[in-house]
Amino acid sequence: MPVHGAIDFVVFIPDFQLSTEKARAALPKRIDHHDAVYNLARAALLAGSLTTGKLENLDVATGDCLHQPYRFSLIENGEDIVREAKELGALGAFISGAGPSIVAIVYKGDRDYIEKAQALCESKYPHWKAVQLRCDEVGTTVKRL
């Protein structure tokens, strides 16, 4: 899926690990139909927003009720990091996969954001660090040798 080139990612990485097995065990065995529809609609909005560049939709599109509410209890300061990442100006923020890292979507080349994120970690969350990653719009390629 080609991603609109106006974004980068800031990843908040804690100094602890969370096993996928433990993260999966935190999830309920069954989900409510309403919750499934909620997440499916947001997944479609996320894909559409990332490909069209409608970045104003990313906060809503990164909303979740299937795994984040259950996994935040396993990620010390995780919910606070997501909230504060948005307060710093992230377009959206969420748990990366099973966790424990948190991903914030930011405007491409926003040096102010990464500086503020690093300062936030140093001052309030010393067990976390913030790292800026570029969006790879090509993905893995295989070339003939």
Ranges and model annotations:
Residues M1-G5, Y38-N39, K86-E87, F94-S96:
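Solvent-exposed alpha-helices and their adjacent loops that cap or buttress functional pockets
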Residues V10-S73:
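Active-site rim beta-loop-alpha module in soluble metabolic enzymes
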Residues F9-V10, S101:
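Residues embedded in well-ordered beta-strands
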Residues L50-L145:
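Glycine-rich, charge-dense phosphate/pyrophosphate-binding loop(s)
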